[in-house]
């Protein structure tokens, strides 16, 4: 009877140790990874900004950065505070295109273990994006991101391997200097999942936003219109065809659906099918 009792106690201790080992090990590993990111965050952020300012016509400026391990879970993130992007190098406020209070760049936990620091996710929270179409037809944001280097080389330098983008409370406006028309979109929240292969580029989007159309400083009939959009886009690289999978759009209380395609090699032929 005593031997049975001893065996029971041994098994109990074994399972208790196994339980605590299984519970504590992931916490220790996660803590170590957070510590690694904390130690290297300055060099990671400085290299990203240095390469971006070197590669692009525009310029980037930030206030500070810190580790935010749960801001974009399951990715371990660095919070870049007060991110600003300018059209040129002189950083005039009049040429500021982007101002984001918190920009979280996320890294995959498993890849960190192997020493890779590719940016897997971006989450932008509270800020604005001001797109201007100049009278000569140029866009300030396109000019800011002009580069003499191939896109693939830039991706490698910036360690970009984006799989998701999230937006929270981002005000996006596009102003046309020629006709004085401004389209303003207040994005309450948006989630985008990205997947790229040699053949296709796929993007899933779920978003809620408000739309305003402004002419010469005055709002038009499009004022504070609430939209919800859920769609999937699939771009076939070889055929240059964009497939629009079944999409649902809600405008105020009305909902409609559509799907179709855009053929860029055939004079940008648009073929959309709407459903009630």
What are these regions (language model features)?
Residues 64-76:
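Short edge beta-strands and adjacent turn/loop segments
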Residues 53-62, 239:
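Short secondary-structure junctions
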Residues 2-57:
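N-terminal type II signal-anchor transmembrane helix
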Residues 93-98, 200, 206-240:
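Beta-propeller and related beta-repeat scaffolds in trafficking/envelope systems
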Residues 2-14, 58, 74-77, 81-200, ...:
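Secondary-structure transition motifs
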Residues 170-172, 240-249:
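Transmembrane beta-strand segments that form the barrel wall of outer-membrane beta-barrel proteins
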Residues 259-261:
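Short, T/G/N/S-enriched strand-turn elements that build extracellular solenoid repeat scaffolds
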Residues 250-255:
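Solvent-exposed loop/turn segments connecting transmembrane beta-strands
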């Amino acid at each position: 009877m005593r031997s049975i009792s001893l065996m029971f106690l041994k098994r109990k201790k074994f399972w208790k140790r196994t339980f605590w080992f299984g519970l504590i090990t992931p916490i220790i590993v996660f803590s170590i990874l957070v510590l690694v990111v904390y130690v290297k965050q300055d060099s990671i952020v400085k290299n990203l900004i240095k390469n971006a300012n070197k590669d692009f016509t525009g310029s980037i400026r930030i206030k500070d950065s810190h580790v935010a391990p749960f801001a974009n879970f399951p990715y371990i993130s660095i919070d870049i505070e007060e991110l600003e992007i300018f059209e040129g190098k002189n950083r005039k406020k009049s040429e500021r295109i982007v101002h984001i209070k918190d920009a979280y760049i996320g890294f995959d936990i498993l890849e960190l273990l192997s020493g890779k620091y590719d940016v897997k996710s971006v989450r932008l929270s509270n800020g604005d994006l001001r797109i201007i179409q100049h009278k000569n037809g140029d866009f300030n944001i396109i000019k800011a991101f002009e580069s003499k280097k191939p896109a693939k080389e830039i991706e490698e330098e910036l360690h970009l391997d984006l799989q998701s983008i999230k937006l929270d409370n981002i005000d996006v406006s596009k102003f046309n200097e020629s006709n004085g028309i401004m389209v303003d979109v207040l994005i309450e929240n948006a989630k985008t999942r990205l997947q790229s292969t040699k053949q296709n580029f796929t993007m899933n989007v779920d978003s809620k936003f408000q739309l305003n159309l402004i002419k010469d400083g005055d709002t038009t009939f499009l004022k504070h219109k609430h939209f919800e959009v859920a769609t999937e886009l699939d771009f076939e690289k070889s055929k240059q065809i964009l497939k629009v999978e079944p999409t649902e759009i809600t405008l105020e209380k009305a909902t409609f659906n559509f799907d179709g395609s855009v053929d860029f090699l055939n004079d940008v032929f648009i073929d959309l099918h709407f459903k009630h």
